[in-house]
């Protein structure tokens, strides 16, 4: 299960098709382009809205090849022979694989790449977006700022590649909607605080660890080995008492750990969903949160009940998409479900071979697999 909360951040719908455009329908402000709903599976892209391949898998997919979801600009990050590049919605290389690492394109049409230990931002033509190079570069956020590293320090750049906040921090998070970003500037003490848009300390660096502020004005932080929640003045709204804590979701619940188990607390620090779970993710806009118990993972509703039964080895967040990736417990192969837990498309093993099945459990790849299987 992915842990969305990390020291340095690199990186919905309840029904399946209605909000996604047909491939031939122009995207509008309310209708996203069709390729945003495509699912990368077995080296190809499956379109749930049409229940058909948008881009068919290759005849022979290599194990280390990767195909990532399409960005809004119609380009998808892809890996071939150990190098990253970008393909278009026909599956053709728009930017040939040449990078050691890379990110998907952001909404400002820029992507972060690294080659020969040097990081640059490129445009949709694969050209360098600006002259400045970096030790490490990350995706642009909705605030049009990106975290970038110069030597061993981090700062923020704008969409023109200029330093908005000079690189002087040893660790840093993206800015939260309230305009504050968790940061640490001293490698000796590793104390965390919060900076404002000018890079000045809004909340002094005096915490062992600090997380992002949520819409309710609270942020998780730790002191004395325990986690609690700060208000926007840096005071404890919920005193440190948890083994771990994560930012609040939009529904007002934050996951927290006690005695090695995870549950969910409200803004007063009271348990709303008791600590039953071995692993837990944040609640999403569709009201679901991934969780794991006794070795199996599923999705909880806001009452703490299993909305989608714990039946998978691993589950991933929906991330505002109409589908989520899961790992099947019987085969350890990936599959994709909707917010009701129904299969959209999945890999399976038949006759000793890996195949792709649709929602009706029909083999859709390889196309002539059934006849070949019958002969064995």
Locate predicted features:
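Residues in and immediately flanking transmembrane alpha helices
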Residues: 15-16, 351
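Sec/Tat signal peptide C-region and signal peptidase I cleavage site
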Residues: 17-21
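Residue-level detector of conserved, function-critical positions
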Residues: 22-376
């Amino acid at each position: 299960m992915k842990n969305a909360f990390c020291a340095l951040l690199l990186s919905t719908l309840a029904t399946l098709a209605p909000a996604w455009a047909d491939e031939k329908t122009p995207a509008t402000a309310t209708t996203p382009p069709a390729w945003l709903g495509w699912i990368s599976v077995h080296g190809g892209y499956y379109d749930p809205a049409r229940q058909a391949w948008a881009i068919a898998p290759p005849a022979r997919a290599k194990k280390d090849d990767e195909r990532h979801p399409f960005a809004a600009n119609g380009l998808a990050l892809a890996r071939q022979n150990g190098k990253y590049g970008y393909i278009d919605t026909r599956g053709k290389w728009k930017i040939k694989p040449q990078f050691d690492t890379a990110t998907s394109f952001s909404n400002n049409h820029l992507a972060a790449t690294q080659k020969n230990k040097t990081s640059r931002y490129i445009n949709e033509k694969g050209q360098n977006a600006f002259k400045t190079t970096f030790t490490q570069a990350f995706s642009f956020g909705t605030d049009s700022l990106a975290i970038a590293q110069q030597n061993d320090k981090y700062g923020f750049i704008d969409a023109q590649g200029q330093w908005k906040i000079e690189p002087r921090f040893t660790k840093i998070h993206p800015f939260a909607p309230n305009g504050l970003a968790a940061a640490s500037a001293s490698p000796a003490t590793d104390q965390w605080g919060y900076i404002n848009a000018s890079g000045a300390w809004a909340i002094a660096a005096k915490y062992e660890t600090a997380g992002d502020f949520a819409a309710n004005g609270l942020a998780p932080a730790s002191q004395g080995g325990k986690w609690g929640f700060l208000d926007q003045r840096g005071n404890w709204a919920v005193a440190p008492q948890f083994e771990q804590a994560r930012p609040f979701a939009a529904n007002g619940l934050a996951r927290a750990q006690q005695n090695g188990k995870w549950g969910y607390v409200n803004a007063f620090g009271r348990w709303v969903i008791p600590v039953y779970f071995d692993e837990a993710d944040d609640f999403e806009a569709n009201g679901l949160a991934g969780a794991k118990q006794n070795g199996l993972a599923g999705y909880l509703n806001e009452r703490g009940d299993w909305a989608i039964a714990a039946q998978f080895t691993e589950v991933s967040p929906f991330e505002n998409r109409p589908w989520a990736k899961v790992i099947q417990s019987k085969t350890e192969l990936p599959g994709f479900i909707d917010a009701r837990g129904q299969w959209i498309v999945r890999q399976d093993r038949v006759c000793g071979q890996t195949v792709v099945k649709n929602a009706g459990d029909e083999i859709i790849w390889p196309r002539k697999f059934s006849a070949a299987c019958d002969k064995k």
